[in-house]
Amino acid sequence: MDKEELFQARTNPDFLKYLNETRVNSIKAKDIALMYETLDSMLVLDLDEEQINELYQEILKLAFENVEKIINKNKKLKLEDEHLFYARALYEHAIEKWSNENFDGAKELLFVMVNLIEDELLQKALNVLIIFLSSKMELDEFYDSKVDLEKASDEKYGYFIVNFNFDSQKYLKENKRILEQEYENLKHLIVEHK
């Protein structure tokens, strides 16, 4: 969308009414895909921050409720259908914690995700993030200096940082002890749920 199209969408009362109805209905229906579609539209259009935050909180609430059900069934999250959106919500919440310099909170959430996600590439990427979080590197510095912004990845990874400007496999090997120590410190988070 160009600036003119964004302005038209932002000022079109019918579209805004539709978007608000969709927001309300997606929350009532507990439809995480529709909730995210609405949230993404609201963010692009830079609409009411309070409604955006309310919708985001509903997404987190729904994701955590459903992830708990999945854990209680001893299942794992696959990066497809609504599971992809649950993973996105947990991940975005972890990144939000990191951006607020809550390194331990972000690390805990990413650790739980590593043990919950059924996807090797994402698990490795999350482990890389855990190692950087252990050094308390700020998110902006990490993003500017360690993320490969040019490399395209599979669409299902579009919500996650999986491309780095270094050999992540080698990095994981070189930092194996740090990761093992973090796992030891965080294992209580998953043992309690088993």
Identify the function of each model-found stretch.
Residues 1-73, 132-194:
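N-terminal alpha-helical interaction modules that lie
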Residues 34-39, 86, 90, 127:
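TPR repeat positional signature
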Residues 65, 119-120:
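Short coil loop/turn residues that delineate tetratricopeptide repeat
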Residues 52, 64-88, 93:
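Extended ligand-binding groove/face enriched in aromatic
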Residues 78-85, 102-105, 122:
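Structural signature of alpha-solenoid helical repeat junctions
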